[in-house]
């Protein structure tokens, strides 16, 4: 087998997820005559020395990846300042943190008291967390300036809105984060049955998925747009337009690719699933319409009963309109199994009754034998 320290896919080493720290009263149980000052000194030195021994062990074992220490969530520094000073003074290469807008709004334990939080505006919260030193503002402090920063869990909380991911990504970049790992993605085979504080999948949560794509560009320091009022976000970069819902934004040139949900200046579509419009050979466009999606049980509740939480509809039919400039005459084909079946032809804007699936929007009528169109390739 392959040793983890030599595995090319392991970029960094974070040995402990969300570690706990000693507090004064707990320390006093073993040090009954100990003072607060004594505890602070011990916490600083014990944390620093423990981390230094850990880094030394990794290096002696030949592991060359950066060593990351997990600093948890907002506000953790308040009761652990001496330990955090020890982290800053240690030999670890990087620190990691997370942010869950809305988690503090729920009664404890949150998994027994979930609520729908999509309707709440968390942009002021993200700003406040960023500015307050005792929350996550310490990430900008002089003590941690030489430590690389990572987000060990990038996710919302009981929230299906399409605006918050890019705002979080902007904050992460402001404090110097170089890596942000998503938590947690529901595998498509089970996504229809998944409920809880973290529900995220390309098919079942289209607005959230599109917003995460926008956030990816924000994390690369590309300007994006987002607002609570629209519950949406968008970005136009290098010819690709992405939006998680209807939002006013300036698009300075004709998009080459479009990923979106709902209506925009270039697409009218009443379906609730994501769509992808991508260029392909001979000036054609490839259109993918994802299934319509609807929550039929509360997505924010921990539902592991085997009953569906989301309904996906592959048969729903909606008018689709593509309004890119200078489209001219176009022929539309739909994939049916191995076949491309003619749907309609249009002049100017492309309009047709569509249902989830794949389409080709061709500049020229496909010169394929009718038998091939009907029977498919290979028959």
Feature roles, as predicted:
Residues 1-2, 75-88, 161-169:
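Short, acidic/polar
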Residues 9-17, 42-82, 92-99, 146-153, ...:
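Aromatic-lined carbohydrate-recognition surfaces of secreted/lumenal glycan-active proteins
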Residues 67, 78-158:
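Glycoside hydrolase catalytic-domain groove-lining segments
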């Amino acid at each position: 087998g392959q040793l983890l320290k030599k595995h090319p896919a392991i970029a960094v080493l974070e040995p402990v997820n969300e570690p706990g720290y000693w507090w004064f009263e707990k320390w006093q149980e073993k040090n009954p005559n100990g003072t607060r000052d004594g505890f602070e000194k011990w916490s600083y030195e014990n944390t620093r020395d423990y981390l230094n021994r850990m880094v030394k062990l990794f290096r002696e074992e030949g592991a060359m990846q950066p060593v990351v220490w997990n600093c948890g969530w907002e506000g953790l520094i308040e009761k652990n300042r001496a330990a955090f000073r020890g982290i800053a003074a240690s030999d670890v290469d990087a620190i990691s943190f997370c942010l869950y807008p809305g988690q503090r709004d729920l009664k404890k334990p949150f998994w027994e008291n979930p609520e729908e939080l999509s309707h709440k505006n968390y942009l002021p919260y993200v700003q406040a967390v960023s500015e307050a030193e005792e929350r996550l503002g310490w990430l900008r402090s002089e003590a941690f300036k030489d430590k690389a920063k990572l987000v060990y869990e990038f996710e919302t909380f009981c929230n299906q809105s399409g605006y918050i991911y890019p705002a979080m990504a902007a904050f992460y970049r402001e404090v110097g984060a170089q890596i942000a790992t998503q938590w947690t993605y529901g595998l498509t085979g089970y996504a229809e049955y998944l409920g809880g504080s973290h529900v995220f999948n390309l098919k079942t949560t289209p607005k959230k998925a599109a917003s995460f794509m926008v956030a990816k560009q924000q994390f690369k320091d590309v300007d994006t747009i987002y607002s609570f009022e629209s519950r949406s976000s968008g970005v136009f970069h290098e010819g690709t337009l992405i939006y998680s819902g209807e939002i006013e934004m300036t698009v300075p040139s004709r998009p080459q690719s479009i990923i979106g949900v709902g209506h925009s200046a270039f697409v009218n579509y009443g379906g609730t699933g994501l769509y992808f419009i991508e260029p392909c050979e001979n000036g054609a466009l490839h259109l993918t319409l994802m299934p319509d999606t609807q929550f039929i049980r509360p997505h924010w509740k921990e539902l592991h009963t085997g009953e569906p939480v989301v309904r996906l509809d592959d048969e729903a039919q909606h008018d689709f309109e593509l309004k890119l400039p200078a489209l001219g005459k176009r022929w539309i084909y739909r994939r049916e199994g191995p076949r491309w079946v003619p749907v309609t032809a249009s002049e100017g804007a492309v309009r047709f009754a569509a249902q989830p699936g794949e389409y080709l929007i061709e500049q020229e009528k496909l010169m394929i034998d009718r038998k091939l169109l009907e029977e498919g390739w290979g028959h």
